[in-house]
């Protein structure tokens, strides 16, 4: 009951309904992470309490961003073990989710999770964001692109903004010190058709984690040349 109460409280804070079904899905997901983490590297966070707080509650906090509540489709870029895409799907069943990751082993794990939790309207893509963002079925097709991946904001923006339709949002889940990144990325975000709309500070209760949600609105279409070819984005971020 302790974990149920912790998760319910976090959901209440962002006006999300929480019930036994959602709780059981999250606990099953936690158990699968712990089981599969013995075979492949999914996360360094493996204790029950830490998974609940540092992964699940961190993902719940993304609902502090109003665009998430209104979105019908979302792509999670560099999803890894499924964060934040799978918790978002569990908590907002009516949203269509795409999980993108470059490592096949992680995709195999995510497909197991989707099957075990009986999640609907969710798909996994194996490959590079740079490639999928040039495909007509994915380019500028999503209400929301989100990423919790470890990369600087200028790089993440070129990976993610091309997936977002005009009027949609890219939400970057960043660490506590994001001001310099934002300053360095502002020009690249503008080039890609985005505009920083808000920065939401996040504290995770009973932990030392402090995060920022950087909310970027897509105000114009991304030029056809972006994203650039694989490898170039990280070597030469837009300035």
From Swiss-Prot:
Enzyme class, one word? transferase
UniProt-listed Enzyme Commission number(s): 2.1.1.-
What are the record's GO terms for cellular component? cytosol
> Where in the cell is the protein located?
Cytoplasm
What InterPro entries does its record include? rRNA_ssu_MeTfrase_G, SAM-dependent_MTases_sf
Binding residues for S-adenosyl-L-methionine: 78, 83, 129-130, 148
Gene Ontology MF, one: rRNA (guanine-N7-)-methyltransferase activity
The source's domain of life comes to Bacteria
Q: Mind listing the UniProt keywords for this protein, alphabetically?
A: Cytoplasm, Methyltransferase, rRNA processing, S-adenosyl-L-methionine, Transferase
Q: Which CDD domains match?
A: AdoMet_MTases
Decide whether keyword Ribosomal protein is in the record.
Answer: no
Family according to the record: Belongs to the methyltransferase superfamily. RNA methyltransferase RsmG family.
Q: What does this protein do?
A: Specifically methylates the N7 position of a guanine in 16S rRNA.
Which HAMAP family does the entry mention? 16SrRNA_methyltr_G
UniProt name for this protein: Ribosomal RNA small subunit methyltransferase G
**Organism annotation:** Clostridium botulinum (strain Langeland / NCTC 10281 / Type F)
Q: Please name the taxonomic classification of the source.
A: Bacteria, Bacillati, Bacillota, Clostridia, Eubacteriales
